[in-house]
Amino acid sequence: MKEEYKLSHLKELEAESIHIIREVAAEFENPVMLYSIGKDSSVMVRLAEKAFYPGKVPFPLMHIDSKWKFKEMIQFRDEYAKKYGWNLIVESNMEAFHAGVGPFTHGSKVHTDLMKTQALLRALDKYKFDAAFGGARRDEEKSRAKERIFSFRDKFHQWDPKNQRPELWDIYNARVHKGESIRVFPLSNWTELDIWQYIRLENIPIVPLYYAKERPVVQMDGNLIMADDERLPEKYRDQIEMKMVRFRTLGCWPLTGAVESEADTIEKIVEEMMTTTKSERTTRVIDFDQEGSMEQKKREGYF
């Protein structure tokens, strides 16, 4: 093959993801793209924009707001939704929020179920979405590693890992009965390093929390938790110290550990990723609140 016809590794991944996104737009009546404000979501949104350029993305973005996201995440979401004219839906479980549900009072498992999973399932039912894009990658965590790109959900939005559809080459089965749906993961074959290299290549805006900076953190169960607002319990406040840290993954601030790092530019992050031996999910408290935690959450309808 002539050199000019060869695609780079990133361009191959890009082409595969764009094909998946277009396939969903063609096959489903009412798809939605779940937007978590993180680096993977930012890449997925850019791919969707490319897939339909110069037209507009033909489906909305939806953010499930747990009310415990980092302040910088919400600021970034609102700023860029306005700047790029996104059709953005924001949904929350306000009943649980007003009842005082939170990670410090109820623990990570109950908080995640009520403020994330149940909020998501209600929103999917409310808008009658039949397909939902997610930014999960197979290299993140073992239960995600075995999940199909087109991941079938029954009428209760539940996933059965022992009853998955075969996926041969780039042929995807989009058939569902009324009430059933598909979760679609166009970034399945990307790695964390691929994501960062693509962000650098495309100059994609990301939340500043990904860059190393002096931040107020406290040690909680082996994790460096950033003191993001006044809801930090009193007992931890005198333990706050300033450290040079960044976040490899973003979620609810009491459940997301920072890592000590000097990587304050994209180039330094890419260099750091080339030598790291741990998944970014090792800093997410929700992945370890019970045995087989992520798989159980996904069975129940989690992202």
Swiss-Prot record:
Q: Its Enzyme Commission number?
A: 2.7.7.4
**Which Pfam families does the record match to this protein?**
PAPS_reduct
Its GO biological process terms? hydrogen sulfide biosynthetic process; sulfate assimilation
Question: Key word Nucleotidyltransferase present in the record?
Answer: yes
Task: Spell out the reaction equation it catalyses.
Answer: sulfate + ATP + H(+) = adenosine 5'-phosphosulfate + diphosphate
Query: So, what pathway does this thing act in?
Result: Sulfur metabolism; hydrogen sulfide biosynthesis; sulfite from sulfate: step 1/3
GO MF annotation list: ATP binding; sulfate adenylyltransferase (ATP) activity
Top-rank EC class of the record's enzyme: transferase
* Keyword hit for NAD: no
Could you list this entry's UniProt keywords, alphabetically sorted: ATP-binding, Nucleotide-binding, Nucleotidyltransferase, Transferase
NCBIfam families, alphabetically?
A: CysD, PRK05253.1, PRK12563.1
Subunit description: Heterodimer composed of CysD, the smaller subunit, and CysN.
User: What biological function has been recorded for the protein in this entry?
Assistant: With CysN forms the ATP sulfurylase (ATPS) that catalyzes the adenylation of sulfate producing adenosine 5'-phosphosulfate (APS) and diphosphate, the first enzymatic step in sulfur assimilation pathway. APS synthesis involves the formation of a high-energy phosphoric-sulfuric acid anhydride bond driven by GTP hydrolysis by CysN coupled to ATP hydrolysis by CysD.
User: Family assignment?
Assistant: Belongs to the PAPS reductase family. CysD subfamily.
This one is known as: Sulfate adenylyltransferase subunit 2
Organism equals Bacteroides fragilis (strain ATCC 25285 / DSM 2151 / CCUG 4856 / JCM 11019 / LMG 10263 / NCTC 9343 / Onslow / VPI 2553 / EN-2)
